[in-house]
Design a protein with these regions (language model features):
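Domain-level signature for respiratory redox metalloenzymes
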Residues: 1-116, 121-248
Length: 248
């Protein structure tokens, strides 16, 4: 402790679990701000922040597969499609050969349609059916979760080369196709969820990278500052105080 390289905070994850997974809810069992999909009150709170009908998130109350489980199922031929971003799983997953295929039918990675977002060739892109060229961290706006749990905002320095795009652009383009024809109340589902940043008809963000990043950050801040959203505040002010205590 208190020696170089011996700090109390872990450098966790693939690639940054405290910044891109725990805080924003990309784990299969998590919602943003370390809330849990299995906790009904956490789901109601998240619905209030995202302006979703009560019960909308109940469909995900049973967590999906964690990473190792997902790759185990992939090796059995039970995963039809996998899309990876921000990590090089073919390099970092332990004993990858066990995922290449097992059992009489020898199913595995080669039976799964794999999409990889990357900036240069890696072991993961060698297994990919489709590689989407994306921007490096200096070629777009973004945040990074530091070991001491502060969030650092980094600014775009240069344009991405060629046809490379912000990862978020690829997610938006797939999302509006997946949600095509879906409604939340009387509103188009994609526009309800993402219309504040993205114009699906123009296939582009409504603002520049900096403003888009700011809008997303301000939305995320509500999870730890319910005063910014009256509906979320009402749920946070529970009678026994347990929910508010967990948030703090």
């Amino acid at each position: 402790i208190a020696q170089p390289g011996c700090g109390p905070f872990s450098l966790t994850g693939q690639p940054t679990a405290c910044g891109t997974a725990r805080e924003v809810g990309t784990f299969s069992h998590r919602l943003p701000a370390d809330l849990l999909v299995a906790n009904e009150q956490h789901r109601r709170y998240t619905e209030a922040i995202w302006d979703l009908p009560q019960g909308y998130l109940d469909e995900i109350k049973a967590p999906g597969m964690h990473t190792v489980k997902m790759f185990r199922e992939l090796s059995k031929g039970n995963i039809d499609f996998m899309w990876s971003a921000h990590n090089n799983w073919a390099q970092s997953m332990p004993n990858l050969t066990r995922f290449l295929g097992e059992g009489a039918d020898n199913k595995g990675i080669f039976d799964t349609f794999i999409v990889v977002n990357e900036v240069y060739p890696t072991l993961s892109t060698q297994y990919a059916d489709v590689v989407l060229p994306v921007a490096l961290w200096v070629e777009r706006e973004g945040q990074f979760g530091n070991a001491e749990r502060r969030t650092a905002v980094f600014e775009k320095a240069v344009d991405a080369p060629g046809e490379a795009k912000w990862d978020l652009w690829t997610f938006m383009e797939v999302a509006h196709r997946v949600l095509d024809g879906e409604k939340i109340g009387s509103e188009d589902a994609f526009d309800h969820l993402f219309g504040f940043i993205y114009d699906k008809n123009a296939r582009d963000f409504k603002n520049d990278d900096r403003e888009t990043n700011r809008l997303l950050w301000e939305e995320y801040r509500i999870f730890s500052n319910p005063e910014m959203n009256d509906k979320a505040k009402a749920i946070n002010d529970d009678t026994d105080g347990t929910f508010g205590a967990k948030l703090k």
